[in-house]
């Protein structure tokens, strides 16, 4: 018989709960606040069947475009053929978590604002552009003696006899 093509086909391991994370859902899952524009990771919780997204969206990062009482609307990119479409899906809060994709950007932005404020107080202009890492500085290897290595000539006749 042919394999089924159901909504949850081939998700035995994909939707399995992690080791020592089975059982009740912590209350903090429901007490988190989501705002429009936040980045979230779609991470399906196999224990809750309501509001579960399709397996394609598991592990995807999207942006919240709608917030309802029990669910959030997430806008996720999906490649279809040769184009990328922004798909809008509604997912229950149990299946999403705050993404850390913009964490580094927010820290850099905060640091740059502090640097700009300090530079403005001193009356100077600074560049907040990131510079690529340059080559490593050179160093001298000390305490080593040079040893000249010469190749040993290969003797075909002796090698066939089994000797050196």
Curated annotation (Swiss-Prot):
The keyword Amino-acid biosynthesis does not apply. GO terms for biological process: translation. PROSITE patterns: RIBOSOMAL_L21E (PS01171). Pfam families: Ribosomal_L21e (PF01157). InterPro entries: Ribosomal_eL21, Ribosomal_eL21_CS, Ribosomal_eL21_sf, Translation_prot_SH3-like_sf. One of its GO terms (cellular component) is nucleolus. GO terms for molecular function: structural constituent of ribosome. Keywords: Ribonucleoprotein, Ribosomal protein. PANTHER family: 60S RIBOSOMAL PROTEIN L21. Belongs to the eukaryotic ribosomal protein eL21 family. This is Large ribosomal subunit protein eL21z/eL21y. It comes from Arabidopsis thaliana (Mouse-ear cress).
